């Protein structure tokens, strides 16, 4: 079953964020997690191989924006970098409230319209977010805009090497209604090569929950 983005958002608002205790997904009754349980269930360990490898890119910088932060696992992962100031960004107010209650600096906002000025953060990081977006162009452009030196994007669905992106992958084997896209490296590269704020970009393999890292160096 493929799902349009508007139907995906409607499903989530009517189920996870409605206070229901259970929901039906492809004919199965599934227990509805609380907002906190849901947020934590998608965090994974801060010691995941892919997280550790990506995190090595943070250490020389002083500020980071975590786009689509969820429960903000990277806040805990960067504690050894004493000079690095963390800010989380998530579109779900309930999740942001949970983070704030834990003392984590976090704001409500969309990756399509990041509520910060140009070059506000040394590093902008996003993990497992782009695949859920209706299009990759605007969120990537926004991350580049607010970054001063570096943008790091981790993909859990490995991008295609060439060809056109695939929209709305099948989600029948998931417990939730999920909106997934598989994007194309060649299409993303074309976008980056025409952006005068991009100095260079590189794809590399990751092990763990993430499959591919896109590293974008900024020139401003």
Task: Label each residue range with its predicted role.
Residues 215-220:
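C-terminal lobe and adjacent flexible extensions of AdoMet/dcAdoMet transferase-like proteins
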Residues 149-157:
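Conserved beta-strand signature within the Rossmann-like core of class I S-adenosyl-L-methionine
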Residues 167-187:
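Acceptor-substrate binding/catalytic loop of class I
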Residues 125:
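A conserved beta-strand element that flanks and buttresses the S-adenosyl-L-methionine
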Residues 197-208:
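Conserved S-adenosyl-L-methionine
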Residues 133-142:
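A short, conserved alpha-helix within the catalytic core of class I
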Residues 1-113, 140, 181, 208-212:
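Conserved N-terminal segment of class I S-adenosyl-L-methionine
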